[in-house]
Amino acid sequence: MRYFRPLSATAMTTVLLLAGTNVRAQPTEPTPASAHRPSISRGHYLAIAADCAACHTNGRDGQFLAGGYAISSPMGNIYSTNITPSKTHGIGNYTLEQFSKALRHGIRADGAQLYPAMPYDAYNRLTDEDVKSLYAYIMTEVKPVDAPSPKTQLPFPFSIRASLGIWKIAARIEGKPYVFDHTHNDDWNRGRYLVDELAHCGECHTPRNFLLAPNQSAYLAGADIGSWRAPNITNAPQSGIGSWSDQDLFQYLKTGKTAHARAAGPMAEAIEHSLQYLPDADISAIVTYLRSVPAKAESGQTVANFEHAGRPSSYSVANANSRRSNSTLTKTTDGAALYEAVCASCHQSDGKGSKDGYYPSLVGNTTTGQLNPNDLIASILYGVDRTTDNHEILMPAFGPDSLVQPLTDEQIATIADYVLSHFGNAQATVSADAVKQVRAGGKQVPLAKLASPGVMLLLGTGGILGAILVVAGLWWLISRRKKRSA
């Protein structure tokens, strides 16, 4: 997926006192075999399952795996690198060992640290066999592209790549081997390998701690991922996917569409570039494993997200139409009038969408049923664009660059509020400030504040004071020793 995964903290010596060690052990047992795909090599299959193209190809018109895609992070944009076998701008000169180090440990051939927008904390448990297959695929089947990708230039202190080595220790990013769990069958083990390693689902769906390392106590319980919300996919019946049928889960992962859910944002990209191409047996294995994930309930959720239906519409369409006109639409903040103007032609005045389901119902929809409204806000701001089975699903964006109807933060807030109260979870509310935050890329994480001028000044002042204290302490010790020897 194309949103930020964990990013380094600056080098903090105090953290090192609490840190563990980073040790790589080799797997002793193979993973369950994937479903048979005779039309492609195993390495090609693994590249699809690992979703390499989503980040390393710059949009639908970009050159395959040539990098250049801007991955949004709290510290700034991180540009994906060229991983074609180009010997001038790609990884064509990498040995298998160097490729493995980059993939599993985030260390380039020149020894520099890779930013963890690359999910090496998930890939570090890939088996040796799979790493070799991926290497063979990239080196022999991918077309080399002799073109550079933009350089990542993050603000200080995040521009210091060496600090990533300290972050890996402090955040306990360890290369633990994959171990086959003999208490479960092959299907479950294959599902776990796909979810935790290849598809790296936890990179988005597991929340992060202060150091932006995965908080495993809330494994797959949902997290903010840039402007979007990666939902809870534990087996919780109200907060997660516990009320979904196996068929619904299978269909959603394969197509991005069910009667009560539609994929958008990073999840739409994962389905478009990766999941839709996996064999049915592998999708079923993912469903099997997800069914075993312990439920993590969220406070305030009393029914499943798709069981909310808001309240019956209390306004007259005619009255709403009379309160707006093309000349006043840009200024109105009447939620009903705005909904009727920019939403109802597809989703209908009653919010139930088209009869054939092409335009989804907003009633009984997981996006409108969440307590966290970020996905609804982001869908309005950025639209929906996914292609599955060579069929594109498109909802226009209504953000500032909209070609259809640019809306202000306040207008988007009133539309979202109207949708939630009439068709979704009436407990959720949206403010103009919430829209502004989503538009800006989501909540600022505490570590990102290290790059602010005020914090840098404070850290700099603290460093100077610390140096003065150290010098003063040394002077005192030397003076004391001289007095004793006198």
Swiss-Prot record:
Keywords in alphabetical order, please.
Answer: Cell membrane, Heme, Iron, Membrane, Metal-binding, Repeat, Signal, Transmembrane, Transmembrane helix
**Which residue ranges traverse the bilayer?**
458-478
Per UniProt, subcellular location reads as: Cell membrane
- The record lists heme c 3 as bound by 343, 346-347
Give an example GO biological process: fructose metabolic process
User: Which residues bind heme c 2 per the record?
Assistant: 201, 204-205
GO MF term (any one): oxidoreductase activity, acting on CH-OH group of donors
Task: Please describe what this protein does.
Answer: Cytochrome subunit of fructose dehydrogenase, an enzyme that catalyzes the oxidation of D-fructose to produce 5-keto-D-fructose. In the complex, mediates both the electron transfer to ubiquinone and the anchoring of the complex to the membrane.
Q: How does it assemble?
A: Heterotrimer composed of FdhL, FdhS and FdhC.
Under what name is this protein listed? Fructose dehydrogenase cytochrome subunit
UniProt lineage: Bacteria, Pseudomonadati, Pseudomonadota, Alphaproteobacteria, Acetobacterales
Supply the gene name: fdhC
